[in-house]
């Protein structure tokens, strides 16, 4: 994690069952884990590790691609993976049991920082609207069920996504 992200191998025509790293998902989840460790360090009075882990908790931002508005994988040299389809359920490649849509908005420890990655709150709202309104493309992956558009309620990391609307002061849809 020296670079702040886990590298994935660059490949094309990725099968959903091959052995990959799930690098985007792991980078996001490790950032959340680092935040939790930072809180423990702070509680123990370990200021040095608190600061280190809080800094590392921002690593999720290293894989945000502003040109697509998605978290996206990188290869070893730091360039974006070129064969990128936000609708494809890579299963292990870049995302674990997910696609780029399902990985949207996973930064439960830093929702405000995540929102700031977008150019405006309106851009966040538009992306959220697209998540729920863009039709699922019918890709088959046995762990992905319970869709509303591309929002997959059957995948735990997405359960907090609807509440992102309330963070941009749009609470009406989250009441339903």
Where do the model's predicted regions map?
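Hydrophobic side-chain positions on well-ordered alpha-helices
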Residues: 41, 164-165
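Residue-level detector of conserved catalytic or cofactor/ligand-binding positions
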Residues: 166-176
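Active-site cavity-forming subdomains of large catalytic enzyme subunits
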Residues: 1-60, 64, 70
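Short, well-ordered coil↔helix boundary/capping segments
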Residues: 24, 31, 105, 152-155, ...
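Intrinsically disordered, low-complexity regions enriched in small/polar residues
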Residues: 7, 82, 97, 168-170
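Catalytic cores of carbohydrate-active enzymes
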Residues: 38, 42-158
């Amino acid at each position: 994690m020296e670079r702040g992200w886990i590298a994935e191998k660059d490949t094309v025509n990725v099968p959903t069952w091959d052995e990959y790293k799930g690098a985007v998902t792991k980078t996001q989840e490790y950032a959340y884990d680092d935040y939790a460790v930072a809180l423990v360090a702070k509680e123990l009075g370990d200021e040095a590790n608190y600061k280190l882990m809080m800094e590392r908790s921002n690593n999720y931002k290293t894989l945000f691609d502003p040109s697509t508005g998605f978290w996206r994988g990188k290869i070893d040299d730091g360039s974006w993976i070129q064969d990128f389809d936000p609708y494809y359920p890579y299963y292990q490649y870049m995302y674990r049991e997910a696609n780029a849509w399902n990985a949207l908005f996973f930064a439960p420890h830093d929702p405000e920082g995540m929102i700031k990655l977008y150019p405006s709150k309106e851009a966040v709202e538009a992306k959220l609207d697209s998540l729920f309104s863009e039709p699922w493309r019918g890709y088959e992956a046995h762990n992905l069920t319970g869709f509303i558009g591309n929002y997959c309620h059957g995948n735990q990391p997405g359960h907090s996504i609807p509440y992102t609307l309330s963070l941009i002061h749009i609470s009406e849809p989250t009441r339903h």
